[in-house]
Design a protein with these regions (language model features):
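Short, glycine-/Ser/Thr-/acidic-enriched flexible segments
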Residues: 67, 218-219, 260-261
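Helical (often loop-to-helix) elements that flank the catalytic cores of nucleotide-handling enzymes
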Residues: 218-239, 268
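Conserved polymerase palm-domain catalytic core
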Residues: 29-32, 36-37, 89, 104-208, ...
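Conserved two-metal-ion catalytic palm core of "right-hand" nucleic acid polymerases
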Residues: 1-140, 165, 335
Length: 335
Protein backbone atom coordinates (compact mmCIF):
# COMPACT_ATOMS: atom_id res chain seq x y z
CA UNK A 1 0.00 0.00 0.00
CA UNK A 2 1.58 3.36 -1.05
CA UNK A 3 2.23 5.92 1.67
CA UNK A 4 -0.44 8.62 1.88
CA UNK A 5 0.94 12.08 2.61
CA UNK A 6 -1.70 13.85 4.68
CA UNK A 7 -0.90 17.55 4.38
CA UNK A 8 -2.27 20.22 6.67
CA UNK A 9 -4.66 22.64 4.87
CA UNK A 10 -3.29 26.17 4.65
CA UNK A 11 -6.36 28.02 5.97
CA UNK A 12 -8.84 28.03 8.82
CA UNK A 13 -11.78 26.87 6.72
CA UNK A 14 -14.09 23.95 7.43
CA UNK A 15 -11.63 21.67 5.67
CA UNK A 16 -8.87 22.65 8.09
CA UNK A 17 -11.11 21.94 11.07
CA UNK A 18 -11.99 18.52 9.65
CA UNK A 19 -8.28 17.86 9.18
CA UNK A 20 -7.60 18.58 12.86
CA UNK A 21 -10.45 16.32 13.96
CA UNK A 22 -9.10 13.56 11.72
CA UNK A 23 -5.50 14.08 12.86
CA UNK A 24 -6.43 13.52 16.51
CA UNK A 25 -6.58 9.79 15.73
CA UNK A 26 -4.79 9.86 12.38
CA UNK A 27 -2.79 6.63 12.70
CA UNK A 28 -5.82 4.62 13.79
CA UNK A 29 -7.97 5.96 10.95
CA UNK A 30 -5.28 5.45 8.31
CA UNK A 31 -4.83 1.84 9.43
CA UNK A 32 -8.59 1.38 9.28
CA UNK A 33 -8.65 2.87 5.77
CA UNK A 34 -5.88 0.52 4.60
CA UNK A 35 -7.74 -2.48 6.01
CA UNK A 36 -11.04 -1.45 4.42
CA UNK A 37 -9.42 -1.01 1.02
CA UNK A 38 -7.47 -4.26 1.33
CA UNK A 39 -10.47 -6.31 2.53
CA UNK A 40 -13.02 -4.62 0.22
CA UNK A 41 -15.11 -3.50 3.19
CA UNK A 42 -14.93 0.23 2.43
CA UNK A 43 -18.38 1.83 2.20
CA UNK A 44 -18.58 5.43 1.07
CA UNK A 45 -20.23 7.94 3.42
CA UNK A 46 -23.05 10.38 2.66
CA UNK A 47 -22.51 13.56 0.65
CA UNK A 48 -22.87 17.14 1.82
CA UNK A 49 -24.56 18.92 -1.07
CA UNK A 50 -24.26 22.62 -1.93
CA UNK A 51 -23.96 24.99 -4.88
CA UNK A 52 -21.17 27.29 -6.01
CA UNK A 53 -21.57 30.17 -8.44
CA UNK A 54 -17.94 30.87 -9.46
CA UNK A 55 -17.06 30.71 -12.31
CA UNK A 56 -20.55 29.32 -13.06
CA UNK A 57 -23.34 27.64 -11.11
CA UNK A 58 -22.44 24.07 -10.18
CA UNK A 59 -23.80 21.48 -7.78
CA UNK A 60 -21.05 20.22 -5.46
CA UNK A 61 -21.32 16.97 -3.51
CA UNK A 62 -18.62 16.81 -0.85
CA UNK A 63 -17.65 13.64 1.01
CA UNK A 64 -16.73 13.37 4.71
CA UNK A 65 -13.01 13.93 5.35
CA UNK A 66 -12.38 10.23 6.04
CA UNK A 67 -13.82 9.27 2.64
CA UNK A 68 -11.66 11.86 0.93
CA UNK A 69 -8.60 10.30 2.55
CA UNK A 70 -9.63 6.79 1.44
CA UNK A 71 -10.32 7.92 -2.11
CA UNK A 72 -7.02 9.81 -2.20
CA UNK A 73 -5.38 6.52 -1.26
CA UNK A 74 -7.23 4.69 -4.04
CA UNK A 75 -6.29 7.33 -6.63
CA UNK A 76 -2.64 7.13 -5.53
CA UNK A 77 -2.75 3.43 -6.42
CA UNK A 78 -4.71 3.42 -9.69
CA UNK A 79 -3.93 6.91 -11.01
CA UNK A 80 -0.46 6.14 -12.40
CA UNK A 81 -1.87 3.17 -14.34
CA UNK A 82 -4.39 5.40 -16.10
CA UNK A 83 -1.88 8.21 -16.56
CA UNK A 84 0.24 6.09 -18.90
CA UNK A 85 -2.62 5.96 -21.42
CA UNK A 86 -3.80 9.56 -21.28
CA UNK A 87 -3.48 11.98 -24.19
CA UNK A 88 -0.55 14.32 -23.60
CA UNK A 89 -2.51 17.51 -24.30
CA UNK A 90 -5.29 16.78 -21.81
CA UNK A 91 -4.57 19.27 -19.03
CA UNK A 92 -7.18 19.04 -16.26
CA UNK A 93 -6.41 17.53 -12.85
CA UNK A 94 -3.06 16.05 -13.86
CA UNK A 95 0.34 16.52 -12.29
CA UNK A 96 2.49 18.95 -14.24
CA UNK A 97 -0.47 20.19 -16.30
CA UNK A 98 -3.22 22.64 -15.30
CA UNK A 99 -5.00 25.68 -16.72
CA UNK A 100 -1.94 27.86 -17.24
CA UNK A 101 -0.06 25.09 -19.06
CA UNK A 102 -3.10 24.52 -21.29
CA UNK A 103 -3.35 28.23 -22.02
CA UNK A 104 0.35 28.48 -22.87
CA UNK A 105 0.13 25.50 -25.22
CA UNK A 106 -2.83 26.95 -27.09
CA UNK A 107 -1.03 30.30 -27.43
CA UNK A 108 2.05 28.55 -28.80
CA UNK A 109 0.04 26.62 -31.37
CA UNK A 110 -1.88 29.70 -32.50
CA UNK A 111 1.35 31.63 -33.01
CA UNK A 112 2.97 28.74 -34.91
CA UNK A 113 -0.05 28.35 -37.19
CA UNK A 114 -0.26 32.09 -37.82
CA UNK A 115 3.36 32.00 -39.03
CA UNK A 116 2.58 28.98 -41.27
CA UNK A 117 -0.86 29.88 -42.52
CA UNK A 118 -1.03 33.66 -42.23
CA UNK A 119 -4.49 34.87 -41.30
CA UNK A 120 -6.28 31.67 -42.33
CA UNK A 121 -6.69 30.19 -38.86
CA UNK A 122 -9.90 28.92 -37.29
CA UNK A 123 -10.80 27.17 -34.08
CA UNK A 124 -13.54 24.75 -33.10
CA UNK A 125 -14.36 25.60 -29.49
CA UNK A 126 -16.23 22.62 -28.07
CA UNK A 127 -17.91 22.03 -24.73
CA UNK A 128 -19.56 18.82 -23.50
CA UNK A 129 -22.98 19.57 -22.03
CA UNK A 130 -23.21 18.82 -18.28
CA UNK A 131 -20.27 16.45 -18.57
CA UNK A 132 -19.91 15.11 -15.01
CA UNK A 133 -23.66 14.68 -14.53
CA UNK A 134 -24.07 12.87 -17.87
CA UNK A 135 -21.34 10.20 -17.80
CA UNK A 136 -23.03 6.76 -18.11
CA UNK A 137 -21.80 4.32 -15.48
CA UNK A 138 -21.80 1.23 -17.69
CA UNK A 139 -19.60 2.84 -20.34
CA UNK A 140 -17.30 4.41 -17.73
CA UNK A 141 -16.80 1.00 -16.14
CA UNK A 142 -15.97 -0.42 -19.57
CA UNK A 143 -13.29 2.24 -20.02
CA UNK A 144 -11.86 1.51 -16.56
CA UNK A 145 -11.49 -2.14 -17.54
CA UNK A 146 -9.37 -1.19 -20.54
CA UNK A 147 -6.72 0.03 -18.09
CA UNK A 148 -7.23 -1.95 -14.87
CA UNK A 149 -7.33 -5.74 -14.64
CA UNK A 150 -7.24 -6.18 -10.86
CA UNK A 151 -10.67 -7.37 -9.68
CA UNK A 152 -10.34 -5.84 -6.20
CA UNK A 153 -9.52 -2.42 -7.62
CA UNK A 154 -12.42 -2.64 -10.06
CA UNK A 155 -14.79 -3.65 -7.25
CA UNK A 156 -13.83 -0.56 -5.24
CA UNK A 157 -14.06 1.69 -8.29
CA UNK A 158 -17.48 0.34 -9.26
CA UNK A 159 -18.75 0.97 -5.74
CA UNK A 160 -17.58 4.58 -5.81
CA UNK A 161 -19.13 5.15 -9.25
CA UNK A 162 -22.48 3.65 -8.23
CA UNK A 163 -22.79 5.81 -5.12
CA UNK A 164 -23.40 9.08 -6.93
CA UNK A 165 -25.41 11.11 -4.43
CA UNK A 166 -28.63 12.65 -5.72
CA UNK A 167 -27.85 12.00 -9.39
CA UNK A 168 -30.05 9.49 -11.27
CA UNK A 169 -29.13 5.81 -10.98
CA UNK A 170 -26.60 4.72 -13.58
CA UNK A 171 -25.65 8.22 -14.71
CA UNK A 172 -23.29 10.92 -13.48
CA UNK A 173 -20.36 11.34 -11.12
CA UNK A 174 -20.24 14.06 -8.42
CA UNK A 175 -18.26 17.24 -9.03
CA UNK A 176 -15.61 17.75 -6.36
CA UNK A 177 -14.39 14.20 -5.70
CA UNK A 178 -10.80 13.27 -6.48
CA UNK A 179 -12.04 9.99 -7.96
CA UNK A 180 -14.55 11.89 -10.12
CA UNK A 181 -11.74 13.99 -11.59
CA UNK A 182 -9.82 10.84 -12.46
CA UNK A 183 -12.86 9.04 -13.91
CA UNK A 184 -13.81 12.11 -15.96
CA UNK A 185 -10.32 12.10 -17.48
CA UNK A 186 -10.57 8.37 -18.16
CA UNK A 187 -13.87 8.80 -19.99
CA UNK A 188 -12.70 11.95 -21.79
CA UNK A 189 -9.68 10.05 -23.07
CA UNK A 190 -12.08 8.10 -25.27
CA UNK A 191 -12.83 11.34 -27.13
CA UNK A 192 -9.12 12.21 -27.23
CA UNK A 193 -8.31 8.93 -28.97
CA UNK A 194 -11.08 9.47 -31.53
CA UNK A 195 -9.94 13.00 -32.37
CA UNK A 196 -6.26 12.07 -32.61
CA UNK A 197 -6.33 8.59 -34.13
CA UNK A 198 -9.49 8.66 -36.25
CA UNK A 199 -9.84 12.31 -37.24
CA UNK A 200 -6.05 12.87 -37.14
CA UNK A 201 -6.48 16.42 -35.81
CA UNK A 202 -2.97 17.70 -35.08
CA UNK A 203 -3.79 20.76 -32.96
CA UNK A 204 -6.27 19.43 -30.41
CA UNK A 205 -6.26 20.36 -26.72
CA UNK A 206 -8.69 19.50 -23.93
CA UNK A 207 -9.29 20.76 -20.41
CA UNK A 208 -11.90 18.38 -18.92
CA UNK A 209 -15.16 19.16 -20.77
CA UNK A 210 -13.75 22.06 -22.85
CA UNK A 211 -11.67 21.45 -25.95
CA UNK A 212 -10.20 23.36 -28.89
CA UNK A 213 -9.20 22.17 -32.37
CA UNK A 214 -7.21 24.55 -34.57
CA UNK A 215 -7.01 24.37 -38.34
CA UNK A 216 -6.52 26.58 -41.38
CA UNK A 217 -9.18 24.51 -43.19
CA UNK A 218 -12.65 25.81 -42.27
CA UNK A 219 -14.50 23.04 -44.13
CA UNK A 220 -12.38 20.40 -42.38
CA UNK A 221 -13.34 21.86 -39.00
CA UNK A 222 -17.02 21.76 -39.94
CA UNK A 223 -16.69 18.08 -40.86
CA UNK A 224 -14.81 17.31 -37.64
CA UNK A 225 -17.47 19.05 -35.59
CA UNK A 226 -20.18 16.91 -37.18
CA UNK A 227 -18.26 13.69 -36.57
CA UNK A 228 -17.41 14.63 -32.98
CA UNK A 229 -21.08 15.36 -32.24
CA UNK A 230 -22.02 11.95 -33.68
CA UNK A 231 -19.26 10.19 -31.74
CA UNK A 232 -20.23 11.81 -28.45
CA UNK A 233 -23.88 10.88 -28.91
CA UNK A 234 -23.49 7.33 -30.23
CA UNK A 235 -20.34 6.09 -28.51
CA UNK A 236 -20.29 8.08 -25.27
CA UNK A 237 -23.97 8.98 -24.71
CA UNK A 238 -23.06 12.63 -24.28
CA UNK A 239 -24.23 15.83 -25.94
CA UNK A 240 -22.19 18.75 -27.17
CA UNK A 241 -23.15 22.12 -25.74
CA UNK A 242 -25.18 24.13 -28.30
CA UNK A 243 -22.88 27.09 -27.57
CA UNK A 244 -19.96 25.19 -29.13
CA UNK A 245 -18.83 27.05 -32.21
CA UNK A 246 -16.28 27.42 -35.00
CA UNK A 247 -14.71 30.86 -35.02
CA UNK A 248 -12.03 32.92 -36.67
CA UNK A 249 -8.98 32.72 -34.40
CA UNK A 250 -8.02 36.32 -35.08
CA UNK A 251 -11.05 37.42 -33.05
CA UNK A 252 -9.76 35.50 -30.03
CA UNK A 253 -10.47 32.07 -28.54
CA UNK A 254 -11.83 31.90 -25.00
CA UNK A 255 -10.15 29.00 -23.15
CA UNK A 256 -9.06 28.35 -19.56
CA UNK A 257 -9.86 31.85 -18.34
CA UNK A 258 -8.11 33.79 -21.10
CA UNK A 259 -8.88 35.18 -24.55
CA UNK A 260 -6.15 33.84 -26.85
CA UNK A 261 -5.00 35.67 -29.97
CA UNK A 262 -2.16 34.49 -32.22
CA UNK A 263 0.25 37.15 -30.92
CA UNK A 264 -1.06 37.99 -27.45
CA UNK A 265 -3.39 36.92 -24.66
CA UNK A 266 -5.96 38.86 -22.63
CA UNK A 267 -8.01 38.09 -19.54
CA UNK A 268 -11.77 37.79 -19.86
CA UNK A 269 -13.76 41.00 -19.54
CA UNK A 270 -15.68 39.42 -16.66
CA UNK A 271 -12.43 39.01 -14.70
CA UNK A 272 -11.56 42.67 -15.24
CA UNK A 273 -15.06 43.73 -14.16
CA UNK A 274 -14.79 41.69 -10.96
CA UNK A 275 -11.43 43.24 -10.10
CA UNK A 276 -12.70 46.77 -10.74
CA UNK A 277 -15.79 45.99 -8.66
CA UNK A 278 -13.56 44.90 -5.76
CA UNK A 279 -11.60 48.16 -6.02
CA UNK A 280 -14.82 50.19 -5.92
CA UNK A 281 -16.04 48.15 -2.93
CA UNK A 282 -12.78 48.88 -1.11
CA UNK A 283 -13.01 52.60 -1.85
CA UNK A 284 -16.63 52.69 -0.70
CA UNK A 285 -15.81 50.88 2.55
CA UNK A 286 -17.89 47.86 1.53
CA UNK A 287 -14.89 45.50 1.52
CA UNK A 288 -12.30 45.09 4.27
CA UNK A 289 -8.67 45.71 3.26
CA UNK A 290 -7.57 42.20 4.30
CA UNK A 291 -10.34 40.57 2.25
CA UNK A 292 -9.61 42.87 -0.68
CA UNK A 293 -5.91 41.94 -0.64
CA UNK A 294 -6.77 38.24 -0.87
CA UNK A 295 -8.98 38.81 -3.91
CA UNK A 296 -6.59 41.35 -5.43
CA UNK A 297 -3.51 39.12 -5.20
CA UNK A 298 -5.45 36.17 -6.58
CA UNK A 299 -6.66 38.16 -9.58
CA UNK A 300 -3.20 39.68 -10.13
CA UNK A 301 -1.74 36.18 -10.20
CA UNK A 302 -4.27 35.20 -12.85
CA UNK A 303 -3.69 38.36 -14.89
CA UNK A 304 0.07 37.86 -14.70
CA UNK A 305 -0.21 35.06 -17.26
CA UNK A 306 -1.67 37.43 -19.86
CA UNK A 307 -0.67 40.68 -21.57
CA UNK A 308 -2.13 43.00 -18.94
CA UNK A 309 0.72 45.37 -18.07
CA UNK A 310 -1.20 48.59 -18.74
CA UNK A 311 -4.35 47.30 -17.02
CA UNK A 312 -2.54 46.28 -13.83
CA UNK A 313 -0.62 49.57 -13.74
CA UNK A 314 -3.86 51.55 -14.09
CA UNK A 315 -5.37 49.69 -11.14
CA UNK A 316 -2.19 50.12 -9.08
CA UNK A 317 -2.28 53.88 -9.71
CA UNK A 318 -5.95 54.04 -8.75
CA UNK A 319 -5.20 52.26 -5.47
CA UNK A 320 -2.23 54.55 -4.76
CA UNK A 321 -4.40 57.59 -5.40
CA UNK A 322 -7.09 56.23 -3.07
CA UNK A 323 -4.50 55.62 -0.33
CA UNK A 324 -3.18 59.15 -0.79
CA UNK A 325 -6.71 60.56 -0.47
CA UNK A 326 -7.25 58.53 2.70
CA UNK A 327 -3.99 59.82 4.18
CA UNK A 328 -4.81 63.43 3.29
CA UNK A 329 -8.20 63.02 4.95
CA UNK A 330 -6.58 61.65 8.09
CA UNK A 331 -8.20 58.23 7.70
CA UNK A 332 -6.02 55.35 8.88
CA UNK A 333 -5.43 52.68 6.25
CA UNK A 334 -5.28 49.13 7.65
CA UNK A 335 -1.97 47.38 6.96
Amino acid sequence: MPILLLERPQNASGTAKKYWLFSMSKEEKLLRACEEVKNLTYTQGAYTIFKVWEPKERLIMALPFYDRVVQHMIVNIIGPVFEQGFYYHSYACREGKGMHAASEQLSQWMYELMIKEGLRLYGFKGDIHKYFASIPHDKLKEENRRYIGDKKALYLMDGIIDKNGILPDGVGIPVGNLTSQLFANVYGNKLDKFVKHTLHAKYYIRYMDDFIILSADLEQLKEWRKRIEEFLEKEMELQINPKSTILYAGNGIDFCGYIHHPEYKKVRKASVRKLKKNVKQLEAGELERVEFEKKYQSRLGHMGHADTYHLTKAIEYELLFWEWEQTESGIAIPA
